[in-house]
């Protein structure tokens, strides 16, 4: 008897039995997979969620670092700008007594004396030249009278009664003040008018 002719106890050929069993397995598998969730799919979904969260944290971290770098760059630029603007402050403070001395020399000089006129003219030119040079570097003189007292640029020394100047205004300058690029480096010492 050949293998094709061999029959199983039920009367089926072996190939038919294998095919029938395979169809039964295929029919059972879809039902089983519909009822059970593959644990690998859950793990994949969990890992994808963790990855998305990690990417979001990374993006936020990068944005924070970029913002910090930009702020640091701006602060550094401002610091450098201030350093350039106010680098001369110490030097200007050393020059102020010299400028004050030239001012006092002009105040006490006998301008009516013809013998002194050359010296007075020399002092005036020296003072003018020095003030022109410091102005080029942002220094301004505070020496206006009849302006309201400003505590940022004036230091009141005395109150004096006056009919000519409004109360609270600067009546006279005892010592000139100076600013460097808008910042007061020495307040002007002034007398202030008060009502009679």
From Swiss-Prot:
Listed GO MF terms: adenyl-nucleotide exchange factor activity; protein homodimerization activity; protein-folding chaperone binding; unfolded protein binding
Subcellular location(s) per record: Cytoplasm
Against InterPro entries, the record matches this protein to: GrpE, GrpE_coiled_coil, GrpE_head
The reply on keyword Protein biosynthesis is: no
Q: What is the annotated role of this protein in its UniProt record?
A: Participates actively in the response to hyperosmotic and heat shock by preventing the aggregation of stress-denatured proteins, in association with DnaK and GrpE. It is the nucleotide exchange factor for DnaK and may function as a thermosensor. Unfolded proteins bind initially to DnaJ; upon interaction with the DnaJ-bound protein, DnaK hydrolyzes its bound ATP, resulting in the formation of a stable complex. GrpE releases ADP from DnaK; ATP binding to DnaK triggers the release of the substrate protein, thus completing the reaction cycle.
The record's annotation in HAMAP family points to: GrpE (MF_01151)
Q: What is this protein called?
A: Protein GrpE
Q: Which organism is it from?
A: Escherichia coli O139:H28 (strain E24377A / ETEC)
